[in-house]
Amino acid sequence: MGKSKLDAVLKEKTQAKKPIFVPYIMAGDGGIDNLNKRIQFLEEAGASAVELGIPFSDPVADGPVIQDAGQRALANKTTIGSVLEALESEKSQRNIPVVLMTYINPVWKYGFEQFARDCSQAGVDGIIIPDIPMEEEDDVASSLTQHDIAFIRLAAMTSTEDRLERIAKRSEGFLYAVSVTGTTGERAQHENDAFHFLEKLKQISHVPVLAGFGISTAERARELSAACDGVVVGSKIVQLFEQGDEDGIHSLIRESIGEKVI
């Protein structure tokens, strides 16, 4: 459970030279009652871990698809507490690692220590907080470490070499490579230097490197996975769930990791 569980699952994939696929879903989008069903479906479809967004009123890193999902989740009265309660209710039946993505403001209001303790109790394995600068993360990092929860850092293409090295050194679980500039979402044109960026991160990271932001096809997922250890796919997964297209999600995951869809 916790960081050790996430590390073990990802290590198994990388040692077998299999691409890691982490789908993102918004907790509470489609109802909190469906949360565990969706996690189970993604596990059965071939996901390595699940990234679970906590809805927030000012989601600075999210593109329009995920922002809309967040609004639907907020309309369903989704909170950190209700998400953790739902996760804890089926913790013993869940095998796949779960990573929460939230913003620093709701975590600060919840209380760093209480947040880490409750996440651990709910079976959360990792945390992503995209809007906290590395220079201000020590308090929350300490609480997460105490409860064996991986603190996953983001590495941006716009960061300096020195900053990337410091981020890579601190990252736990996996290093989340922001492979495009801007917010999440599909991209009609992907920056060609994404591959160079991912290869550079692979050289300096002691944990798996996953590319995220702007990946909407299995072809693109396979291309980027060739330069790193795998991908995180958010907007496309959220979109397909909203459309009720579970077959589309299954195909996207299977084709992204190089398996034939029957």
Swiss-Prot record:
GO terms for cellular component: cytosol. Pathway: Amino-acid biosynthesis; L-tryptophan biosynthesis; L-tryptophan from chorismate: step 5/5. GO terms for molecular function: tryptophan synthase activity. Keywords: Amino-acid biosynthesis, Aromatic amino acid biosynthesis, Lyase, Tryptophan biosynthesis. Pfam families: Trp_syntA. Its EC number is 4.2.1.20. It catalyses: (1S,2R)-1-C-(indol-3-yl)glycerol 3-phosphate + L-serine = D-glyceraldehyde 3-phosphate + L-tryptophan + H2O. It comes from the Bacteria. PANTHER family: TRYPTOPHAN SYNTHASE ALPHA CHAIN, CHLOROPLASTIC, TRYPTOPHAN SYNTHASE, ALPHA CHAIN. Tetramer of two alpha and two beta chains. This is Tryptophan synthase alpha chain. It comes from Oceanobacillus iheyensis (strain DSM 14371 / CIP 107618 / JCM 11309 / KCTC 3954 / HTE831). The lineage of its organism: Bacteria, Bacillati, Bacillota, Bacilli, Bacillales.
